[in-house]
Amino acid sequence: MEKPAVANHPHAALPPAPGADRHHCLDFADTAATLPAGQSYDLLAAPDSAMRWLATHDLTTPDVQLYEVCAQRMRTLRGHVRALFAARVEGVAPPEESLRAVNQALTAVPSAPLLAWDGAQGLRRVQAHPTDQAVNHALATIAADAADLLTGPDADLLAACGSAPCDRFLLRTHGRRHWCSTRCGDRARAARAYARRNDTSE
């Protein structure tokens, strides 16, 4: 389900896919993809790059230490989110294991501080999970956003990029747009023009 990482991410030259500004889960799903030229990238391939992605999206603070086990958990959830997106786009039933994985992420942390009592301070609100479990909070936030996207009005706009082999996801924010970037759109149009020229020359 996961793709190998490359040293120099071609993703750096690509803008976020349409809709990523409204849904972090869309950008999360697109942290691994194959682009039209056949290049692949994985922005969660290592703890440092995974940490940068979380910090860039305000899902944690730069002082949090991220380990490989945490990056692996992020990659695993990403695979399940991508599977749910693909099922929605294809109009088929989602994989049960992916539903379970997203629900587990959703319930891994409380949605609000709990009520606690101690003799010195009396009643107060406390977080049930310490700050060293910041990844749990980040994954819960991503899972909640994915659930909101898949069950909300934007679900009908969810699409896979139509410029094979690119497999990024996007929201069709403008008409019938089916490309995740201008680069993919230009490539698809060029391929169609080339095919038409070949047809007329035969």
Regions found by a protein language model. Give the residues of each.
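Short helix-coil boundary/hinge micro-motifs
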Residues: 1-160, 168-169, 200-202
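Cys/His-rich microdomains that often coordinate metals
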Residues: 165-170, 188
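Cysteine-rich micro-motifs
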Residues: 175-187
